[in-house]
């Protein structure tokens, strides 16, 4: 197997994780694709050291998170959070539901509603919430990564949760 083949297999193994992390943080699939490409360019440059490492997934998540945070800081004023979410026919955002299962359909409906509610949060609430719940970062780690106080992290996560609770009230 050539180096190119090994890197192609590496990308296939981790591309969904990298893309999902970027989409959760950016709430914009197009920007997430750009970040994912940059992540894999950096991975290619360091492939000899990370390609077979047991910590490759962690390295990729860290690089993805940092690139997303940098992107948010640079382009915050120009962001449009809802511009490309929920595109009909885009398989990455459609939940496959077994037609015979009402429970699965209800779960899919709740999942979609939650994803929309998270995407609708202002970035100062969404980013810490995603880092805490999806990336398993501590409050202190989030504060350090975002360059904000620990109290602000706690407040933003709390307020984000409250908005999500209100948005999810009555969702099947």
Label each residue range with its predicted role.
Residues 1, 5-7, 80-86, 140, ...:
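C-terminal edge and immediately downstream basic/flexible tail or linker adjoining helix-turn-helix-like DNA-binding
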Residues 1-20, 30-33, 44:
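A short, charge-rich alpha-helical start-of-domain segment used by transcription regulators
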Residues 9, 89-119:
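Acidic, proline/glycine-rich intrinsically disordered inter-domain spacer in sigma factors
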Residues 20, 34-41, 54-66:
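Structural recognition of an alpha-helix C-terminal capping motif at a helix-to-coil junction
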Residues 51, 65-83, 93, 99, ...:
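Arg/Lys-rich amphipathic alpha helix in sigma70-family domain 2
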Residues 128-132:
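A short pre-motif secondary-structure segment
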């Amino acid at each position: 197997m050539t180096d190119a083949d090994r890197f192609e297999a590496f990308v296939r193994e981790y591309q969904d994780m990298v893309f999902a992390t970027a989409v959760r943080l950016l709430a914009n699939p197009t920007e997430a694709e750009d970040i994912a490409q940059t992540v894999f360019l950096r991975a290619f440059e360091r492939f000899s050291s990370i390609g077979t490492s047991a910590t490759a997934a962690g390295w990729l998540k860290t690089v993805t998170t940092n690139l997303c945070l940098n992107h948010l800081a640079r382009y915050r004023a120009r962001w449009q959070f809802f511009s490309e979410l929920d595109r009909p026919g885009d398989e990455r955002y459609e939940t496959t539901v077994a037609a015979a299962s009402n429970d699965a359909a209800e779960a899919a409906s709740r999942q979609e509603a939650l994803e929309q509610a998270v995407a609708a949060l202002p970035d100062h609430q969404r980013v810490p919430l995603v880092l805490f719940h999806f990336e398993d970062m501590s409050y202190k780690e989030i504060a350090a990564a975002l360059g904000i106080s620990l109290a602000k992290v706690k407040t933003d996560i709390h307020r984000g949760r409250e908005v999500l609770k209100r948005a999810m009230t009555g969702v099947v």
